[in-house]
Amino acid sequence: MRFAICNETYQNTSFDAMCADAAAAGYEGIEIAPFTLAEDPRDLTLADAISCCTKAKNHGLEILGLHWLLTKPSWFHITTPDAVQRRETARFGRHLVRLCAAMGGKIMVWGSPKARNLLPEWNYDDAFARAAEAVREVAIEAGKH
């Protein structure tokens, strides 16, 4: 069995220092929370992702994937009836797929409960269909990598 750690455990620590400490502690992999790398993860570039991959590999670590995908910006949402908000969330998800692939990751964990919770006035089946539509767009992008 291999062990990995989430990088947000090391908030306020440089990525390189986090990798060094995780490797020294015996971890073999890390999961990345995009909001820990940039206040607005939409600003992250493929070059940033490749740099993270290189730093992790330099410490003998594998980047397994991304998690806490929709934490920042906080207005992203996959079940909302607001089509513009959902479209921007899916666009961001596709961006994260490309970053994850550039980091060598293969897993994207769709946590971020505030980005999928339902308001009482929303119909569950409709919200589920909206979420499936948004995630489908992201999955299509993931299939390219």
Annotated model-derived regions:
Residues 1, 19, 41-43, 79-84:
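Gly/Pro-rich active-site loop or hairpin
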Residues 1-13:
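Boundary/entry segment of secreted carbohydrate-active catalytic domains
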Residues 9-11, 34-36, 69-72, 114-116:
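Active-site-proximal loop/turn and secondary-structure-junction residues that shape catalytic pockets
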Residues 17, 54-62, 75-145:
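Active-site acidic/histidine proton-transfer and metal-coordination neighborhood
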Residues 31, 65-67, 109:
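Conserved beta-strand positions in the central sheet of alpha/beta enzyme cores
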Residues 33-57, 112-119:
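Glycine-rich, proline-tolerant flexible connector loops at the mouths of alpha/beta enzymes
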